Amino acid sequence: MPEKMSLRLVPHLACIIFILEIQFRIADSNDPCPHNQGIDEDIAESILGDWPANVDLTSVKRSHKCYVTCILQYYNIVTTSGEIFLDKYYDTGVIDELAVAPKINRCRYEFRMETDYCSRIFAIFNCLRQEILTKS
């Protein structure tokens, strides 16, 4: 009897292993910096601080989009699931939540159909930066 039961479990176990393998592959593909040992903060601040106006998103290489996304993750602004967390900046008064939150929501909505994680995060951040640059 135990042999029959264990034989019936084999297809179920194979299915579970297959699903887990797919989950891990998806999780790995969403991490723009899986081998990153840290960020050079001077370079990161330079990239984020000297943002050019009117960036053509199609001309930016995916590797740069992923690097910017990695920087945003390093500073805990973005999660690997794409959530944007600015609470610490709101709480300290660095960013005015009432002014910025609607812009973030508009930018997030504008690029909601982008399926590539790095491209979506980069586009949202670029959109927000353009909003800020045009108002400055």
From Swiss-Prot:
Keywords (A to Z) from UniProt: Disulfide bond, Olfaction, Sensory transduction, Signal, Transport
Protein name: General odorant-binding protein 57d
Function as written in the Swiss-Prot or TrEMBL entry: Present in the aqueous fluid surrounding olfactory sensory dendrites and are thought to aid in the capture and transport of hydrophobic odorants into and through this fluid.
UniProt-listed Pfam families: PBP_GOBP (PF01395)
Family stated for the protein in its record: Belongs to the PBP/GOBP family.
Annotated GO MF terms: odorant binding
Gene Ontology, cellular component aspect: extracellular region; extracellular space
Gene Ontology biological-process annotations: response to odorant; sensory perception of chemical stimulus; sensory perception of smell
Signal sequence segment: 1-29
Superkingdom classification of source: Eukaryota
Keyword flag Hydrolase: no
